[in-house]
A protein has these predicted regions:
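Carbohydrate-interacting/catalytic domains
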Residues: 1-50, 74, 79, 131-133, ...
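Aromatic- and acidic-residue-enriched carbohydrate-binding clefts of CAZyme catalytic domains
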Residues: 8-16, 49-76, 80, 100, ...
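Hydrophobic faces of well-ordered beta-strands that scaffold small-molecule active sites
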Residues: 13-17, 43-45, 87-89, 117, ...
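Short, solvent-exposed turn/loop segments enriched in Gly/Ser/Thr/Pro and often Arg
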Residues: 20, 44-53, 91-95, 120-126, ...
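Substrate-binding cleft of carbohydrate-active enzyme catalytic domains
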Residues: 31, 35-47, 65-112, 119, ...
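Acidic, His- and aromatic-enriched active-site or binding-groove loops in soluble protein domains
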Residues: 73, 100, 142-149, 167-177, ...
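Active-site neighborhood of glycoside hydrolase catalytic domains
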Residues: 98-156, 676, 704-771
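Substrate-binding cleft/loops of secretory-pathway carbohydrate-active enzymes
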Residues: 150-181, 661-672, 744, 752-753, ...
């Protein structure tokens, strides 16, 4: 929460006065009463209004001395305060006064009762001058507000104004086309400066608003509610009070007053090709139809899937009743938070299933149920809000008609929800469900012989062929009698209708659709069959599939070379990391480091007295896995860091490394947990070809008996629970493939049953089967072979493998471009261009990607002939100059910005590779399942040379002829252009080795 929010928790609801009424009495009190009645809490005087009553006041736009006495702002402010209103001046800075002169000017305004000022030209003074000016004025009145008119400001200008002391900024809503994603980008930049207020109109917005136009009410209602949802306050022009939307103005202000200020990002949830535009902030959203001619169909499932809020559901009163919007119409909605799903113990009776003999076997077959992992042995992974399609092959003997349904529930619920399946042909049935709670779910499929529909279809064929169906009709009457006996108590209304039909014997009515519907309602299901077991689903929060990781060593964050960094010093880096677009801040182990066999620089076996050692040699006299290294600070310092990261919109990921130094307290407390050699020494850890003399590993099973060491398993689980209690919700797990799979399945199950929102990243650079198995047992994400996939064929085949359904159901990639252990050969000799190439590949191909600090500075110095960093930070402190030349910070920031505004890039799925007539150029598209977001990416894999490559654009996949025209947007520059024809030559250079184009329209 910024300073504006802290001091003024209520939202800014400002009325922009176009002219102060004259005479002041009774005009001004009447205006104040009217503003109060419409729930405003502030009045903005028009530009040029005199701010002082005393003679000789210096204000060039005062409007004449004869008005000074009549328009005394002190009197106006005093009258306004009676109605709970504060008065602001709209100031256009003249060049005749210095910063100190304007300081005196503002102080005099405050002394005359003004609550604050709207500054139109902040560039008149340097940010430091503004900071001093604001501080001086607040020395007179602490709650003085300085609002900054920001429409038209560049990102660089806004960045300079951070910390200058302003309380409010203004979003460029009146200039927005109600489609482009730049509105959310601008909001993020403004919010970093001060709380965001949204003007409903602006004189220079190019709009001629006429309150008498027939569509004015709809237009202004749309604008008012968009402004209210998008910001922490609104600026409303005075003329609206006397228009047909005055009641809507009051409703908006009252809604804002109830909501109060919130510190939440603004997001545009749809792609450029969607029929409508969805703006969402906090728990509220608005759907706009910007088209002036066509209706917009609303896909509430799609909106649900894009919500940035985990475990929440859209208000059913809206989603169940509004399925389209007329041209230029809008629809508001809200979301309701739902509790996470926490498991309860399953009884032995529920687990026990008894098989049936062959003679009693199900007559109906249910096969090839999808999605599933190893026939339900492990949970399918999905993300809350995403629509999950469930399919199966369902059939029985003969040509009988069948029915089928999916039954599903959350693991902490007892009642099942049922969704009827649709027959797609060739015995394939399908249904879709949407999971909106974080946690474990389960589903199964039921199928039955639809006796009535089978009978009805056969008789209709006979009747239409002119055959005698009298006996058949009598058979139908008997079947209806059976149904009546079944349904008499449950469906009395339907029972009465069927009894009348039986009595009449009317064949046409008996075969009618209405009778078939009545029989379906009764549930007249013969040979009902259930699939063999329930299939588990794990619905995780969005960060499990879409996240951006930044790794740093807290001990290297000191501003003094050679001094050990602290958690407090890490906080200084948070703004810069968030500015680059990262949302997960990952720390290697932060625990005490052992002394025995401590490693020296560059993994030397001999450490000097000042060498800091490897953080993976965990444990000393200062504690073990539940302690922090004393030179980093205290546990309370760490909690404060967690709080600060949350304030910056970041999450901390901790390294969970099951590794101990010989000094770890566990060796004395639990010596039986470790592998002691006959000579009394310990066997140190190995991960061939690497050896870790400073680390020993606990043993998960007891010698000879091969029984789990339950006390060790519980202790490791409790370590994770301890850090969860501190506020950590993401863990990167070191080398999980060197620990038993049963342990991981047990421990991850224990954690997720209590805290289903916790995310685990597997750092297992090993064989594919083991990496995939770790995903199956519960890891949310995994490092991948991307680090070593460099050429076109390697990248194409690997992405196609990861995107197959059988892999995607349990394995999610996180593309790290480097790690403290891995300095890829490609980066060692590719220069700045190579870093741009790898960043672009990771950011566009994977929903989650990460980098280890120093990558943005193009660090590549390596140990000769090895894929390791020279002077590795694993063994020493590394202070860096973050502003050094040749960095790629702007490009990384740009890539992350594009990712967040392009839904097609939110996952590794939906990728298709297209012909590029150059083996060094990778060309691909990504699209959402709904095709509302389509992006084309070209990346040159050669970091040393410029290349011109012919690219074949996938017009055929969009149903377009080869000569068609596609309207595009360059996501990096914002430039829009038309692409005519499906083959084009594109140039790539080492300075600009990639492009990202978003499809805006197809012709």
């Amino acid at each position: 929460m910024n300073e504006f929010d802290k001091r003024f928790g209520d939202c800014g609801r400002l009325l922009a006065i176009d002219k102060v009424p004259q005479p002041v009495e009774p005009g001004w009190p009447e205006l104040c009463r009217e503003a109060f009645d419409h729930a405003f809490n502030g009045l903005l005087l028009p530009p040029g209004f005199p701010m002082f009553a005393e003679e000789g006041a210096v204000y060039e736009l005062a409007g004449g001395d004869e008005l000074v006495g009549l328009l005394n702002p002190a009197l106006l402010a005093a009258e306004a305060s009676k109605y709970g209103l504060q008065v602001y001046a709209d100031v256009e800075l003249s060049e005749s006064l210095s910063a100190s002169g304007w300081t005196d000017f503002f102080i005099r305004g405050v002394n005359n009762g003004l609550a604050g000022f709207l500054i139109r030209e902040p560039g008149r003074f340097a940010p430091a001058d503004w900071a001093r000016l604001v501080a001086s004025v607040r020395g007179v009145r602490t709650d003085t507000r300085f609002l900054l008119w920001t429409p038209g400001s560049t990102p660089a200008q806004l960045m300079e104004l951070r910390g200058a002391g302003f309380d409010g900024t203004f979003l460029s809503l009146p200039w927005w086309d109600e489609r482009s994603p730049w509105l959310a980008d601008e909001y993020a930049r403004l919010d970093a400066v001060a709380s965001v207020i949204v003007p409903v109109d602006a004189n220079d917005a190019g709009e001629m608003l006429d309150a008498n136009l027939p569509d004015f009410e709809q237009y202004m209602g749309r604008r008012l509610w968009t402004a209210a949802i998008a910001g922490n306050g609104v600026l409303v022009p005075q003329f609206v009070l006397h228009s047909r939307v005055s009641d809507e103005v009051k409703a908006v202000n009252q809604w804002l007053a109830r909501r109060r200020s919130i510190k939440q990002p603004l997001v545009v949830l749809n792609g450029l090709l969607g029929p409508g535009t969805v703006v969402f902030r906090g728990g509220d959203g608005i759907v706009l139809n910007p088209d002036r001619l066509r209706e917009a169909t609303l896909d509430w499932r799609l909106v649900q899937s894009r919500l940035p809020t985990d475990s929440a559901v859209i208000d059913q009163a809206v989603s169940d009743n509004v399925d389209s919007l007329l041209p230029q119409a809008y629809c508001r909605f809200s979301v309701k938070a739902l509790p996470f799903i926490k498991l309860k113990a399953i009884s032995t009776a529920e687990k026990r299933r008894l098989g049936l003999g062959v003679m009693n076997a199900a007559r109906i077959a249910i096969e090839a149920v999808r999605p599933q992992v190893e026939d339900g042995r492990f949970a399918v992974k999905t993300v809350v809000g995403t629509t999950l399609e469930i399919t199966a092959n369902i059939f029985m003997d003969g040509h009988e008609r069948l029915g089928a349904s999916v039954l599903w529930r959350a693991a902490d619920e007892s009642d099942w929800r049922e969704v009827l399946m649709t027959h797609e042909g060739n015995d394939r049935w399908s249904a879709s469900i949407t999971l909106v709670r974080v946690g474990r779910h389960q589903f199964h499929i039921k199928a039955w012989h639809d006796r009535w529909e089978s009978y009805r279809a056969a008789v209709i064929k006979k009747r239409d062929a002119g055959m005698d169906v009298a006996v058949d009709i009598e058979e139908g009457r008997l079947m209806l009698g059976d149904a009546v006996r079944i349904a008499r108590r449950i469906h009395p209304g339907i029972t009465s209708m069927l009894e009348g039909l039986i009595e009449s014997g009317d064949g046409d009515l008996l075969l009618a659709d209405s009778t078939a519907q009545a029989m379906r309602t009764i549930g007249f299901r013969a040979f009902e069959t259930r699939c063999q077991h329930d299939y588990p689903i794990m619905a995780e929060r969005r960060a499990a599939v879409f996240s951006t990781w930044y790794e740093l060593f807290p001990r290297s964050e000191s501003s003094v070379p050679g001094r050990h960094g602290t958690f407090v010093e890490v906080r200084r880096r948070l703004a810069a990391i968030k500015e680059m677009g990262f949302d997960v801040l990952y720390f290697p182990p932060i625990h005490p480091i052992g002394r025995t066999n401590r490693k020296g620089r560059n993994n030397s076996l001999t450490a000097g007295k000042d060498d800091v050692g490897s953080p993976y040699a965990i444990g000393s006299e200062d504690g073990g896995h539940d302690a922090v290294h004393p030179q980093l600070g205290t546990l309370d310092d760490f909690r404060q860091l967690l709080h600060a990261t949350k304030e910056h919109g970041l999450e901390v990921a901790l390294d969970f490394a099951i590794q101990c130094s010989p000094d770890h307290p566990w060796l004395k407390q639990h010596p039986n947990w470790f592998n002691w050699r006959p000579d009394g020494t310990l066997r140190y850890a190995e991960n061939p070809p690497k050896r870790y003399e400073d680390i020993v590993n606990p043993e998960f099973y007891q010698d000879f008996e091969l029984k789990p060491r339950a006390s060790l398993w519980r202790a490791l689980r409790d370590v994770v629970l301890f850090w969860i209690e501190q506020g950590v919700r993401i863990f990167r797990v070191d080398n999980p493939h060197t620990k038993p799979l049963p342990f991981w399945e047990w421990m991850l199950g224990e954690i997720h049953s209590r805290h289903p929102d916790v995310i685990f990243l597997s750092e297992a650079f090993t064989r594919p089967a083991m990496m995939y198995r770790l995903g199956k047992v519960g890891f949310s994400q995994s490092y991948t072979y991307f680090t070593w996939r460099n050429n076109k064929a390697e990248l194409t085949s690997y992405l196609e493998e990861l995107a197959t359904a059988q892999v995607a159901n349990f394995f999610r990639p996180n593309f790290f471009v480097n790690t403290p252990d891995i300095n890829p050969y490609f980066l060692q000799n590719s220069g700045r261009s190579g870093f741009l190439i790898r960043a672009a590949l990771a950011a566009t191909l994977s929903g989650s990607w990460g980098m280890y600090s120093g990558f943005e500075l193009c660090e590549a110095a390596a140990l000769p002939g090895r894929e390791e960093y020279l002077d590795s930070e694993k063994y020493e402190l590394r202070q860096r100059n973050w502003s050094q030349s040749a960095n790629i910070i702007p490009e990384i920031t740009q890539l992350n910005r594009v990712r967040k505004s392009t839904p097609a890039l939110w996952t590794h799925m939906g990728v298709r590779f297209h012909p590029a007539h150059d083996d060094h150029v990778l060309f691909f598209s990504k699209s959402t399942p709904q095709k509302d977001s389509v992006v084309l990416v070209g990346i040159c894999l050669d970091p040393h040379a410029s290349r011109r490559a012919w690219l074949d654009f996938p017009f055929w996949s969009w149903g377009l002829p080869d000569h068609a025209t596609v309207h595009m947007e360059d996501a990096l520059s914002g430039r829009e252009f038309d692409l005519q024809g499906n083959s084009h030559q594109v140039e790539f250079t080492p300075e600009s080795p990639y492009f990202i184009w978003r499809v805006r329209g197809l012709e």
